[in-house]
Amino acid sequence: MLALASAGVLAGAVACSDNDDNNGPVPVADAGPDGGNGGLTDAGGEDSSTEPPGPNTIAGVVTQTVLVATANDPNVVNAWGLAFTPAGDAAWIADNGTGNISVYDANNTLVNTITVPVPDGIDTAAPSGLIANSLPDNFNGDAFIGVTEEGTVIGFPADGSDPAIRYDNSGSGAVYKGVAIATSGGQPLLLVTNFNAGTVDVFDANYAPTTITGGLTDTTLPAGFAPFNVATFGAAIVVTYAKQDDQKHDDVKGEGNGFINAFDLNGNMATRLASNGTLNSPWGLAVVPNDAAAIQGRLLVGNFGDGKINVFAAALTDSANMSATFEGVLGDSANNPLSIDGLWSLQFPPNAGTFDSKVLYFTAGPNSEQGGAYGSIAIISQP
C-alpha cells in the first residue's frame, strides 16, 4: 500500500497538435460559457496554475490543446466519458450536461450527435462513463456501452440504430459513474460503479445482473467513500474511490479524498495501490502506451477534484504481485502542476486509424461543470 506524498511534478514535455479547421483549438477566452477558460489553455499555452510543487519535484513541461469546447459545440457541456472506435476513426464524448453523445473525427469535425435515452419520468439523461465494446460478440453486439447518473446502462448498436436502455436501475436510486469490461473465469462481465450504493455492479454478457466471485469489495475502505470509476489493465481491475456527499450522488472534493484499489480478474482484492495524498476525487484512468516517447507504461490517474494528473509506475500484469509507485504529477515548464478544471476522462486512441495513439486525450467539465472541453496532451520527452 502506498500513501501518496505531496505532489511532485513529473517530466514529460507535451506538445499540442495543430488543427486549422473551424473546430480546431479554442482560444482561451472562448473555452467556457462565461468567457473564461476554466483552467484550460489553448494550443501552445501553458497552464496558469501557480500552486508550488511539492518536495522531490521532477521538472517537466506540459502544455495542452482544447480541441472542442462549449463555445463551438453547445452540446459539449460537462464532457465526461470518452471512447474511441476500435478502427480509430472517431472519438465518442459523453455530454453529461445535455444528455447527448458527440462524435468527432480526428480532424475535430463533428460527425454525429446522439441523444441518450431516458427512463420514464426523466427529461434529460446525464451520461457519465462510456466505453467501446471490446467483446463485440457479447452485450447484444453493441458498439459502445455507456452508463448514466440516472442509474441506466445504455447500449449503442453497431448498425447505427438508436441507442437503448439495456438495464434500468433508476428505481433503486443508483448513480452510475464508471464502466468497464472484464473477462472472469472465461465469462464476459460488465462492471459499473454505483456511487450511491457504494458498490461495483456486475452484469453478464446479456446485461443481466450477476455476481463476480470476489465481489470487488474492500472491507478496509473508510466509511463515506464509494467506487467512482473502474477500468481493466492487464490482470487487474482498477477501481478508484471518492468521498460521497450527503445525498451520495456527487463527490466531495478535497486533497486526500481518494483511494485506488487493484483487484484480480475474479474480483478478489489484490492490493491498495494508493491512498489519500495527492488523490482528489480520482476518476480518469489510462496507461501510457509502451511505444510512447515518455513515461511509457505508467498508470495515469486524473483528479476530478483539482484537475491534476498523477503518475504511477505500476505493475498490473501479475495478480499476485500488483503494486504502484507514485512518481509525481504532470507539470509545466515552471514546475507547476498541470491542472485541468473539471478533468474527467484520460484516454489514448488505438494504434489503428487516424488518431495518434501516443497522444493523451481528455474531457472536462470546467466552471463547476457548466462548461465542457475535449482536448489533447502529447507527451514527447523522457522524464
Give the location of each predicted region:
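C-terminal motif of bacterial Sec signal peptides marking the signal peptidase cleavage site
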Residues: 11-15
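Sequence/structural signature of beta-propeller domains
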Residues: 18-26, 45, 49-383
